[in-house]
Amino acid sequence: MATYLVTGANRGIGLEYCKQLRERGDDVIATCRSSTQELDDLGVRVEVGIDITSGESVVNLKNKLSGLKIDVLIQNAGVLERNSLLELDPESIRRQFEINALSPLCFTRAMLNNLAEGSKVILMTSRMGSIKDNS
């Protein structure tokens, strides 16, 4: 049995990760800004109020998890503005970059003490990062 930490776990792919990991008997720590009934019903550890762009939020989680070994960190939290690249305003582009690229790296750095040798980090991405698919 392994311990997984999943960011952006309250819906979509993150929620499905939590479901499948729980079904096979793994320990799951689900993080999100706000939970859902479906996530709460899984019986996994849910840490709410976690905004990966907020240094304070990440430090609070780091302190809560002090001494806990994480075998796999699944960085799933992200946003997607459903506009074409030409329609995106600079603030929206900055926000997406911060949430989808910079914050997962900072979050991983904050969790380094929880990641032992052999632990794995999974960084989810989307087709939004593709120049070919978005031009």
What is the predicted role of each segment?
Residues 107-111, 115:
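Hydrophobic positions on the long internal alpha-helix
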Residues 10, 14-20:
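N-terminal Rossmann NAD(P)H-binding glycine-rich loop of SDR-like oxidoreductase domains
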